[in-house]
Amino acid sequence: MFGSVVFFSESQIVGKVDRTFPNARNDIAWSIMMDADWCPYSQIPKGKYDLGVVTIPKTKPDMDINSFRQWCDKIVVMQEGPHWYFQDYSVEQQFKFIENIRNADWVWCHNKSDVKYYKGLGCKDVRVMRTLMLPEGLDSTQYSSDKEGIILGGNFTSWYSGLDSYLIAHSVNEPITNVSMGRKQPEEDMIPDIKYLPYMSWREWIDECGKYKVGIHMMRTH
């Protein structure tokens, strides 16, 4: 459908990954379905591609996506997180982010509700690409109805709305567990009635979610 495809990433993945890859989050899952290669931002691709997929990194939002055009006929930006998250960047980085998504041949967004927003920012082509999860490698034998406890889906930031999730969980008489994401705040460990898990790969996290009676994740998607 798209010909040869490469995903550019902050990770050090090079080449293709298979369906049992332990950290098969959304972008990796889609790369598997497209039989795409991976190339770190710090390296030069080994050849030319029909399509280059860029998820603008949170740690470097002012990167120039046009720099990838020397290796790719088309460049697409893949949305990560809610469409408003870039407004937490510095003013200069916010304008650079807008410039990047306008320069992309198209934007892949999560939901139909995101399409109007990105078009309103001046993007010339916006398409919905749903979140994809691959079941390979998941242990279905551990799932049962005999469970207890609540698992929260994110930390105490505007991105994950962890406080909203916690307040809902706190109204139920069940032990509360939360995940440790990259944006976890140090003060979260001081909350007495939350047990925190260590940082996990995607597959470890999905397996862990299956151990609890209730999951609460109030992350805003618009």
Model segments located where?
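N-terminal pre-catalytic "stem/leader" segment of glycosyltransferase-like enzymes
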Residues: M1-K74, D105, Y117
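Conserved catalytic-core segment of nucleotide-activated headgroup transferases in glycan assembly
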Residues: D18-F21, L134-W205
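Active-site regions of enzymes building and remodeling cell-envelope glycoconjugates
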Residues: D35-W38, Y49-V53, C72-I75, A104, ...
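Short, polar loop motifs at secondary-structure junctions
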Residues: S42, P57-K60, H110-V115, V179-E188
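A short, histidine- and acid-enriched strand-loop-helix "catalytic/donor-clamping" loop
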Residues: V76-V91
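Membrane-proximal helix-turn-helix segments that form the acceptor-binding/catalytic region
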Residues: Y89-V107
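Donor nucleotide-sugar binding/catalytic pocket of nucleotide-sugar-dependent glycosyltransferases
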Residues: D105-K116, C123-D139
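Acidic donor-binding loop of glycosyltransferase active sites
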Residues: C209-H222
